[in-house]
A protein has these predicted regions:
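Accessible peptide chain termini
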Residues: 1-2, 131
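Extreme N-terminal basic, low-complexity initiation segments
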Residues: 2-11
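Catalytic core of pol beta-like nucleotidyltransferases
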Residues: 10-63, 71-77, 87-134
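Short, well-ordered beta-strand segments
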Residues: 65, 82-84
Length: 134
């Protein structure tokens, strides 16, 4: 837990359950994506579905999809995974989610929270590419 955000005691105290669970559940090194194994979109979706109860209960995610190069089968060995979620607007939970997914996948992850005022071009791209996990 201390490696995640040791300088911010408020963050750690407020989200200790999520951070502890994340660290315990997927105990991998923080820079594991250097050893990134390229996966298919189906493999990423399967991994997320296996962790669906964790994602819903620990992070409060109502829906989740993958978009971008992975969803279009255009990813390369250095690609990140783009994930869009519907959840309450909480930056600390969003950061913890990003860290959880990066440890789970072993690569860089970009997390976008869907909301009413989001950039329309981004929203259109997400809808065009979206592969819904739940």
């Amino acid at each position: 837990m201390s490696e995640i955000h040791s300088s911010n005691a408020h963050f750690v105290e407020k989200y200790k359950d999520v951070l502890y669970f994340s660290s315990f559940f997927v105990p991998l090194t923080s820079n594991l994506w250097q050893l990134h194994i390229m996966r298919t979109k189906g493999e990423y979706i399967e991994m997320l579905r296996k962790h669906m109860s964790v994602l819903k209960q620990q992070f409060g995610i109502r829906s989740m999809c993958i978009f971008g190069s992975v969803a279009r089968d255009e990813q390369g060995s250095d690609s990140d995974v783009d994930v869009c979620v519907e959840m309450e607007p909480d930056i600390y939970v969003l950061v913890a989610l990003k860290q959880f997914l990066e440890k789970l996948f072993g690569c860089s992850v970009d997390v976008v929270r869907r909301h009413r005022n989001m950039n329309k071009l981004l929203e259109e791209q997400i809808e065009r590419d979206a592969l819904y996990v739940f």
